[in-house]
Structures are given as structure tokens and as C-alpha cells.
């Protein structure tokens, strides 16, 4: 259960072209130690939101942003060292091996290099830790970033379509990691796969036309309920 507020964003608007906002009056509150699923139709703004929080999008404005009780900006070093983001697609650091990438990230975050033995085993990644990232398959590249994310244990994990590219066993292992992450911090993850949302989330946020249109909690979190809302959006 969450014991306080970790992140609060009020009336976020974000755009690639100023006259075509992707997010509009988007507000979000995340508690400490909770798992929150973000779901929406293609083009609803899930990836745009994550890019904005990552500090990769210049076209945005918002009324307020509070992190751990204090006003902040997405590019503040203190915030960046307390969050890690796994993007839906990421082809950076192509000439690093996994071990080199992990060492680089740990140094950037100012933490000792974590022991990833169990994570590597759980994702069946043992044969790939010394392979250049550019030579990895889509699924194994995703595992590189997921292992790093769960090894770092930041206060906030942002995962954009984390299941994409994973095999069945790795997907099941990922569900366990997401569900258990409340021991260390908060996870916000986007997905178009209802199963992943329903199996792991304490709350589910439905993103429609650039803003949160519905929040599901507790027993409301069922594939049928969420599918019904998404279907009604598709009809609009």
C-alpha cells in the first residue's frame, strides 16, 4: 500500500507541433510503493507522456510538478537519479555490452554496481551479458534495460510497453518483478496488453484523447471492464 505521494503533475500539456497537443490538461498522482498501469488506444499519448517525464520533449507546459514533496523539473539531476525509464524502443549505447552499460548507468546514478545474478537468470540472459547491444535481438535488448531497471531499484520506474519482444517465460518473470516492486518503490507502466495491466496493477489509468478519463482500482480492475471503456473510446 502506498504511504504518501511520490509524484504529482497538474494540467500537463505536451506537443510535437504547438497547434496539435498530444496531452491536454493531463493530471497524475502517484503514491509511494504502488504499481500503476497506463492503458489507452494507439495515439492516446502514452509514449509522449513518458518522453516528457524523461526530459526528452521540449514542447510542454504544466501548472505544477511535485516530486517527493518538492517542486521540480523533469531535467533536475535529483529527479533523474531517482527514476529509470525503459522505452518501448531504445537503440542507444549500441557499442556497449550489457556489463559495460550496467557499469555506466550505476556510475551515472552514483550507486555501486548491483548484483544482477538472479535477474540475468530469471530473464534467461546468461549467454548475452558480453554481447554488444547492437547485436542483440529486440527481446534481448529489452531484457538489457529491464534487468538494469530492476537492479537499480529507483523510487520510480517508468516502463513503456515492457512486454513487447519478450518470450513467455520472461514475460511471467517480468510480471513477478513488477508486482513485487512495491517493496522498493513505484512502477508506472504503459501497455496495450490487458493481461499485464490486470495481473500487476493496484490502479489502472485509462488515457483518452490526451488526458486520464477513467481510473480503476481494486476489484474494478478486470479485463472486461477496461475493454468496455476502450471500446467506447474507439467508437467516439
Locations of the language-model features?
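A short, flexible loop at the N-terminus of ABC-type nucleotide-binding domains that lies
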Residues: 1-25
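The feature captures the beta-strand-to-loop junction immediately N-terminal to the Walker
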Residues: 39-41
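Helix-to-loop junction immediately C-terminal to a conserved catalytic motif
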Residues: 54
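Conserved ABC transporter NBD signature motif
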Residues: 59-79, 214
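Conserved ABC ATPase "signature" region
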Residues: 103, 113-129
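Catalytic Walker B motif of ABC-type/P-loop ATPase nucleotide-binding domains
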Residues: 157-161
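Conserved H-loop
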Residues: 184-190
Amino acid at each position: 500500500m502506498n504511504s504518501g505521494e511520490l509524484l504529482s503533475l497538474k494540467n500537463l500539456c505536451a506537443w510535437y507541433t504547438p497547434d496539435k497537443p498530444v496531452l491536454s490538461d493531463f493530471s497524475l498522482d502517484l503514491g509511494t510503493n504502488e504499481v500503476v498501469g497506463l492503458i489507452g488506444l494507439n495515439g492516446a499519448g502514452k509514449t509522449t507522456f513518458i518522453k516528457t517525464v524523461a526530459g526528452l520533449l521540449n514542447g510542454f507546459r504544466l501548472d505544477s510538478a511535485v516530486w517527493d514533496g518538492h517542486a521540480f523539473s523533469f531535467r533536475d539531476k535529483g529527479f533523474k537519479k531517482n527514476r529509470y525509464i525503459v522505452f518501448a524502443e531504445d537503440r542507444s549505447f549500441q557499442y556497449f555490452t550489457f556489463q559495460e552499460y550496467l557499469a555506466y548507468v550505476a556510475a551515472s546514478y552514483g550507486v555501486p554496481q548491483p548484483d544482477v545474478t538472479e535477474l540475468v537468470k530469471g530473464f534467461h540472459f546468461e549467454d548475452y551479458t558480453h554481447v554488444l547491444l547492437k547485436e542483440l535481438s529486440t527481446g534481448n535488448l529489452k531484457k538489457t534495460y529491464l534487468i538494469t531497471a530492476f537492479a537499480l531499484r529507483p523510487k520510480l520506474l517508468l516502463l513503456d510497453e515492457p512486454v513487447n519482444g519478450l518470450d513467455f517465460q520472461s514475460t511471467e518473470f517480468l510480471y513477478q518483478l513488477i508486482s513485487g516492486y512495491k517493496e522498493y518503490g513505484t512502477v508506472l507502466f504503459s501497455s496495450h496488453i490487458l493481461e499485464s495491466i490486470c495481473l500487476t496493477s493496484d490502479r489502472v489509468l485509462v488515457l483518452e484523447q490526451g488526458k486520464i478519463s477513467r481510473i480503476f482500482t481494486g476489484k474494478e480492475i478486470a479485463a472486461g471492464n477496461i475493454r468496455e471503456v476502450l471500446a467506447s473510446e474507439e467508437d467516439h
